[in-house]
Amino acid sequence: MIRVIVMYPNKAGGTFNYDYYLKTHMPMVKQKLGAALKDVRVFKGVGAPGGKPAGFVTTASLFFDDVPAFEKAFGPHAAEIMGDVPKFTNIEPQVQIDERLL
């Protein structure tokens, strides 16, 4: 099992439209990725230890069986999915692929 984590850093002047993201963008992502997408979790950053601000305003974890399954599902739709990002944020997302160990 792998997780593709999409992270939106908390930055000065950053904006994020949660209504569009949750009601339009994420349903589109789910539809495009189809059965290859095993689960998805979205989190809103609320803070860090010591009362500091969250490092990321939002993170999305998308779960797939393996990297080839992700690449096969995402590849044909990458331009459309990533092209939708400016409709809900001016923050450049950071993406990382993690392998589940435990």
Spans of features found by a protein language model:
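Macromolecular interaction modules
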Residues: 1-102
